[in-house]
C-alpha cells in the first residue's frame, strides 16, 4: 500500500527517484516495473505497479466496446500508458509527452493512493490539496458514509 505525499525532483532528463521507502515493495511486487499514464480526471499522472495495472487493463477490456464512453476511456488510459522500470538507482524516466500533460518541471509531488501513485506538479498539488480541504470542511459537504470513515 502506498500512502503519503512525497516531494520529488525531476532532473534535466525528466527522471525522478522513487522514494526509498517504496522501492522494496515495488521490487518484490513487480521487479520495479511500472506503468505511467494520464489521470483522465485530474491534471496529473498515475503511476501503477505492473500487477495493479494489469487489473485495470482487465477491467477496461471487460467494458462493452460499443459504448463511446468506454472507448474514450480506453483510448485515454491505454493510449497514453508507458511501460517503465526503476533503474539501479531507483529512478524512472517520465516521457516528455506525459510531463507536458501534467505540466511537470523540476518540483513535483508523488502522492500515494493505496494501490498507485499520482504524480503532480508541486504547485498544482498544493492548490488542489488546499481546495479539497476547504471543500470537505464545508458543513454538509461530506456524506454520512464518508464521515463514518474518519477517526
Swiss-Prot record:
GO terms for cellular component: cytoplasm; nucleoid. It comes from Pseudomonas putida (strain W619). The keyword Glycoprotein does not apply. The keyword Repeat applies. Belongs to the MraZ family. One of its GO terms (biological process) is negative regulation of DNA-templated transcription initiation. Residues 5-52, 81-124 form the SpoVT-AbrB domain. Keywords: Cytoplasm, DNA-binding, Repeat, Transcription, Transcription regulation. Forms oligomers. GO terms for molecular function: DNA-binding transcription factor activity; transcription cis-regulatory region binding. This is Transcriptional regulator MraZ. Its main location: cytoplasm. It comes from the Bacteria. It is found in: Cytoplasm, Nucleoid.
